[in-house]
Structure formats: structure tokens, C-alpha cells
């Protein structure tokens, strides 16, 4: 694995994700090799329970990596993913693994979140594959990455390097073009909280809509409560209507914190907010 990491040229860092290495040290051929070696190791100590448990516990990072990479794929073997998720949950409970990462997220909570967040939903988002026009563009490299990431149907993970689009020290705004007028009932934007990376939930989100892309009608303004926990969290900010709204364009305006607050160790420095997915139904 060390040789594969060096050969890939992909660096490791504190807020890394297995997804960063899906084409390097965690590419399919190497993952098959790692699993084969663990299969052999488990077989070799099958008659010795204490040693078997050690091998099974050592295998957990590979199992976690498989799950993380699988959720980023557009084509999924759902039976296989559910089987792996069930086994991972069974093992972390058996070995009483307390945390998943440096931010104390629970691995049992991760399994629950995985089923709710990353497994395909019955109702598809109307925003899937829609055109996104930025009124206040994302920061730096995220401007290019943001062309598709907000409407690709794939939710980001617990680190911002994975599918998230960020704005630093500013507000954000964009318009989603559904291509034609459609009846919609709700819009929801997904945000990331990771204070160790100076990523905070925004202060406010405003939704509006228009059939012509020019004359917008206010839908809803949502103020977000402050979040100070060290755990990585996700928050969906949603506007709903009891009656269908016929529209083609949906505008999302986000008011960011812009600076780290007084209680944060980065006080006075620019803060971020990150969005991954916008869901319209």
C-alpha cells in the first residue's frame, strides 16, 4: 500500500478521504488485492478467535474505504453495498469502535447516515443534471468543479475534498435552470459543518423562483442556528409548498458567516461554507 501511495503521487493529509485515492492506492485492482490478503489472513487464524478478531478489526479501514468509494459511483451494486454496510456495522459494534474520525463521529451513526443519505431514493430530484449559473461564484478551483457537483445526484462525504463546492469569506448565489417550466413542491440545499477546516453553516438561505429567469418571486427565507460542535455534520435547508409551483428557474442565495466567530480559534480569519447537492422535487 505504501508503494501504491508513493507511485500515485497523491498526498495524504489530515482531512483526507478514501475517495481522494480511488484512482491511486485504493483503485479497484489494489482493493481486490488487499481483500484477498485479508481473506487469507482470516483463513489462517480461523481456529484462533483472539487472532481472528485482531485481523477483522485491522480490516475495518479497508471496509470503510470500500463504502466511501462506492457511494461516489453513479452505477451501484446495491445488494453488494448493503451486504458490506451490514458487515461493517456488525464489526464496529462487536469491537466497540468509538469514533470514525478525528472529529469523534460515531461509526454506528455513519452506517445509519449512509442508508439515509447515500443510498438511492425512490423519487429523483428534478434538478438532476440541470444547468447551474453562478451569480456569486465559488472560490478558486471550486468555480470549475461547481459546474456539475451541485446537481449530480451524489452527496458529499465527511470531508470537503469530496464533491463539495465552497465559498470563502463571502456570500453565494446561483440559479438552477430546469430546462422548462415544471411543477415543484420543494427545494433543499445540503450544507457541511467541519469547524476544524473553518467550514461553518451559513447564516441564512433565501429561495425564490421565476418562469422567465428575470422576475423572481420570493419563496422562503431560512435563518440557521449557530453550530459549535466539533463533529462533522450535514444540514439540509428546505423550502416547501403545499400547492405545486410552476417554474423553470430556482434561485438560491446564501448569506455566509464570512469570518470565523469569536469562539472559533480562527477568529477574524475568513470562514467557508460548502454546498454539495441541491434537490428539487
Walk through the language-model features, giving the residues of each.
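Short glycine-/Asp-/Thr-/Trp-enriched loop segments that recur within the blades
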Residues: 229-233
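Short intrinsically disordered coil segments
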Residues: 147-149, 223, 267-269
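Predominantly extracellular/luminal regions of secreted and cell-surface proteins
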Residues: 121-155
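Aromatic, loop-rich ligand-recognition surfaces of beta-strand-rich domains
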Residues: 156-220, 236-281
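Solvent-exposed serine/threonine-rich low-complexity stretches and specific carbohydrate-binding patches
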Residues: 218-228
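Catalytic domains of carbohydrate-active enzymes that cleave complex glycans
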Residues: 1-125, 129
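Short, surface-exposed beta-strand/loop "edge" segments at domain boundaries and coil↔beta transitions
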Residues: 70, 141-142, 184, 260
Amino acid at each position: 500500500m505504501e508503494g501504491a501511495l508513493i507511485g500515485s503521487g497523491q498526498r495524504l493529509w489530515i482531512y483526507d478521504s478514501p475517495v481522494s485515492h480511488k484512482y491511486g492506492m485504493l483503485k479497484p485492482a489494489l482493493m481486490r488485492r488487499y481483500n484477498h490478503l485479508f481473506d487469507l489472513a482470516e483463513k489462517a487464524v480461523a481456529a484462533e478467535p483472539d487472532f481472528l478478531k485482531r485481523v477483522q478489526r485491522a480490516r475495518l479501514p479497508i471496509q470503510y474505504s470500500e463504502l466511501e468509494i462506492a457511494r461516489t459511483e453513479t452505477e451501484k451494486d446495491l445488494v453488494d453495498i448493503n451486504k458490506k454496510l451490514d458487515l461493517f456495522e456488525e464489526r464496529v459494534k462487536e469491537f466497540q469502535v468509538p469514533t470514525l474520525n478525528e472529529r469523534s463521529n460515531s461509526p454506528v451513526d455513519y452506517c445509519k447516515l449512509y442508508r439515509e443519505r447515500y443510498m438511492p431514493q425512490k423519487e429523483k430530484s428534478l434538478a438532476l443534471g440541470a444547468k447551474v449559473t453562478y451569480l456569486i461564484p465559488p472560490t478558486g478551483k471550486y468555480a470549475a468543479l461547481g459546474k456539475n457537483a451541485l446537481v449530480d445526484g451524489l452527496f458529499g462525504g465527511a470531508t470537503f475534498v469530496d464533491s463539495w463546492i465552497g465559498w470563502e469569506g463571502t456570500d453565494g448565489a446561483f440559479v438552477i435552470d430546469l430546462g422548462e417550466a415544471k411543477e415543484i413542491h420543494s427545494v433543499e440545499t445540503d450544507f457541511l459543518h467541519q469547524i476544524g477546516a473553518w467550514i461553518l453553516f451559513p447564516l441564512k438561505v433565501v429561495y425564490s423562483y421565476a418562469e422567465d429567469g428575470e422576475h423572481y418571486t420570493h419563496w422562503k427565507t431560512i435563518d440557521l442556528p449557530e453550530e459549535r460542535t466539533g463533529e462533522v455534520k450535514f444540514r439540509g435547508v428546505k423550502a416547501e409548498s403545499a400547492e405545486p409551483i410552476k417554474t423553470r428557474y430556482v434561485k438560491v442565495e446564501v448569506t455566509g458567516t464570512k469570518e470565523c466567530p469569536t469562539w472559533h480559534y480562527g477568529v477574524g480569519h475568513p470562514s467557508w461554507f460548502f454546498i454539495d447537492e441541491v434537490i428539487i422535487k
